[in-house]
A protein has these predicted regions:
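C-terminal motif of bacterial Sec signal peptides marking the signal peptidase cleavage site
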Residues: 12-13
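Residue-level hotspots at or immediately adjacent to binding/recognition sites across diverse folds
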Residues: 16-354
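Positively charged n-region of N-terminal signal peptides that target proteins for export
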Residues: 1-3
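Sec-dependent N-terminal signal peptides
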Residues: 7-9
Length: 354
């Protein structure tokens, strides 16, 4: 969603709902600020391992570390600086292979791919609809991915690739629920869409009367929508979705235009996103911009926003604050190491230890 992000700052697997995970009280999270080499606003992070991490953001900024954050390399995308592209999402598979999504109106929404560590890039997709604005994307594997745009003329805009990004055809309108007036996503962190296994994906929406989660269980061929009990309208809705398995997920957001606001902006599901219930609001005020499940730690997730960084050990039912600095996105490369990024080139390493 281009309008409200401040620059300064299908069948689902069925079964009985599991009890909330038992928190590991001995484990703790610590933050390690990194030495930065940019002052750009960083809005996305992808860590395919504990040692390899890619981050991206405004002013065509892309950085990569191959040594767990000890050093960072700038990565040049030819022509991106001329258009001052905002790389608001990144997905990396290793130190060599990564995809970038630039967000913006019309042709400023693009998808790029590198297979040689950023030495060269292929522009795979350029948006040709002046009213579309691509917010986020995610991949099931190196060949199959999904990208989401704000709705256009009353229809949802979901694209699927099955050939490594060479083509991105639109999902037919008949396979998608109708869009609400104004419905889209908040392109804050690259976490408004999440994929799981080889078939499941979820997309969080906002800026319409009601916040919703779109879900697919067949690799993006068909989609359904569920209302989420998070305030909607204008600058409100969902900015992030996070799932630890095909049943248990968390949807987070709020009012992205009011950093002092407090509202019911966290919801949980135990049936794959068919139904949602309100959960405990995170500790920091304002909206959650990004969230991620910590892999290998059931029920653990980290949520970030312009007013702080929280973590939960019980799927969002309770929260612990770790920082009050501004962050826009968060990602984990293992059960022990993650990364949060934000304004003025901020990169912070998150370490889970006993």
């Amino acid at each position: 969603m281009k309008r409200w992000l401040p620059l300064a700052m299908g069948m689902v697997a069925c079964g009985p709902a599991a009890a909330p995970p038992v928190p590991d009280s001995a484990a703790r999270l610590t933050l390690e600020p990194q030495t930065t080499i940019t002052t750009a606003l960083l809005q996305a992070v992808s860590a395919p391992s504990a040692r390899v991490v890619w981050v991206s953001g405004h002013a065509a900024t892309v950085l990569r570390s191959r040594d767990g954050g000890q050093t960072w390399e700038p990565v040049n995308v030819p022509g991106a600086a001329v258009d001052s592209l905002q790389f608001r999402d990144v997905q990396a598979f290793d130190a060599r292979t990564a995809y970038l999504l630039s967000a913006g109106p019309g042709p400023l929404s693009r998808i790029y791919k590198t297979a040689d560590g950023g030495r060269s890039w292929e522009r795979q997709f350029t948006n040709t609809d002046s009213t579309a604005f691509y917010d986020c994307f995610a991949f099931w594997d190196m060949r199959r991915g999904v990208a989401f745009s704000d709705a256009v003329r009353g229809r949802m805009m979901v694209r699927i690739t099955e050939d490594g990004g060479s083509t991105w055809p639109l999902v037919p309108a008949a396979a998608l629920p109708p869009a609400q007036p104004g419905e889209g996503a908040f392109a804050a962190s690259g976490t408004c869409v999440v994929t799981l296994d080889q078939r499941h994906a979820w997309i969080g929406t906002g800026a319409a009367d009601t916040a919703r989660v779109l879900r697919t269980a067949d690799g993006g061929r068909t989609w359904s929508a569920s209302v989420v009990p998070v305030p909607g309208g204008g600058t409100k809705g969902l900015a992030a979705v996070a799932f630890r398995d095909t049943l248990h997920g968390t949807a987070l957001g709020g009012d992205v235009a009011d950093p002092k606001s407090r509202m019911d902006n966290v919801a949980i599901t135990e049936d794959g996103g068919r139904t949602w219930q309100r959960a405990t609001t995170q500790t920091f005020s304002g909206a959650v911009y990004g969230a991620v499940v910590i892999p290998g730690r059931p029920g653990w997730l980290v949520a970030v926003g312009p007013r702080g960084l929280d973590y939960s050990k019980d799927d969002g039912r309770s929260w612990t604050n770790l920082d009050t600095l501004a962050y826009w996105s968060v990602g984990f490369g293992s059960k022990d190491v993650g990364w949060a990024v934000g304004p003025r080139g901020r990169i912070t390493r998150i370490v889970v230890s006993r």
